């Protein structure tokens, strides 16, 4: 099967999302799929396999007119350009994280898997309007809706009315290995959460846990002043 992963971010990069996508494409290649990773012409000037330490046959296609992270009008233009290239190479199945790209793919009746990491709060007005008007995520051309956490799954069911049977929870992981030596036992731990304060990311769970667990100290790093006030 020829699979095209349409990815808006930089490759190669140490960005967590880039690491996850690289490993995912490598895994699909090992399963004998013809995998194409379509991205903007951004990222480090290092060979893909060497940077990630992967042995795979993932084909990288960088769309050269997008030399920076696609923002504004380029956000929409990259979606169109990446889909056109995917069609040109006769893709059987598309994979994307991008809500606008997904909308275009189902509009032209292409088979697609959507990988969802967050809610719609960080999306632009166009995307929010499209998902308010149309029942996008229940479209028959979507093979599966991948939610990376149960929190995202609950959001999809409650807020976007996605059918539960269409959603599969598959958490992201990194290929990094850590070895901790000479750890000292402590009566109290300092627990840190780093990342987005979007509810679907699980930050509200950390707050609830901190209220319940009085023994340890909890710290949250991320978000803006508005999100912090809302979290409290």
Question: What kind of region is each of these model predictions?
Answer:
Residues 7-14, 26-77, 152, 223-227:
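N-terminal strand-loop element at the rim of the active site
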Residues 10-13, 67-70, 91, 102-103, ...:
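A short, histidine- and acid-enriched strand-loop-helix "catalytic/donor-clamping" loop
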Residues 1-21:
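Nucleotide-activated donor-dependent transferases that construct or modify glycoconjugates
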Residues 43, 194, 217-231:
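Glycosyltransferase donor-sugar binding loop
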Residues 74-78, 110, 118-141, 154, ...:
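Nucleotide-sugar donor phosphate/pyrophosphate-binding loop at the beta->alpha transition
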Residues 4, 146, 183-201, 207-213, ...:
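Conserved donor-binding/catalytic core segment of Leloir-type glycosyltransferases
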């Amino acid at each position: 099967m020829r699979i095209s992963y349409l990815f808006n971010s930089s490759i190669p990069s140490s960005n967590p999302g880039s690491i996850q996508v690289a490993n995912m494409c490598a895994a699909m290649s090992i399963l004998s799929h013809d995998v194409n990773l379509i991205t903007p012409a951004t990222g480090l000037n290092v060979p893909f396999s060497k940077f990630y330490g992967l042995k795979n046959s993932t084909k990288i296609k960088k769309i050269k007119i997008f030399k920076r992270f696609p923002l504004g009008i380029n956000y929409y233009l990259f979606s169109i350009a990446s889909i056109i290239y995917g069609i040109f190479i006769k893709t059987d199945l598309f994979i994307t994280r991008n809500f606008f790209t997904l909308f275009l793919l189902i509009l032209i009746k292409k088979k697609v898997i959507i990988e969802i990491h967050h809610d719609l709060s960080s999306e632009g007005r166009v995307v929010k309007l499209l998902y308010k008007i149309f029942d996008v995520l229940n479209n028959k051309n979507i093979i599966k809706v991948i939610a990376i956490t149960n929190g995202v799954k609950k959001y999809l069911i409650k807020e976007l009315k996605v059918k539960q049977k269409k959603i599969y929870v598959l958490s992201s992981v990194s290929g990094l290995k850590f070895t901790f030596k000479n750890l000292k036992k402590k009566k109290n731990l300092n627990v840190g959460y780093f990342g987005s304060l979007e509810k679907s990311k699980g930050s509200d769970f950390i707050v609830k846990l901190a209220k319940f667990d009085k023994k340890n100290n909890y710290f949250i790093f991320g978000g803006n002043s508005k999100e912090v006030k809302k979290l409290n």
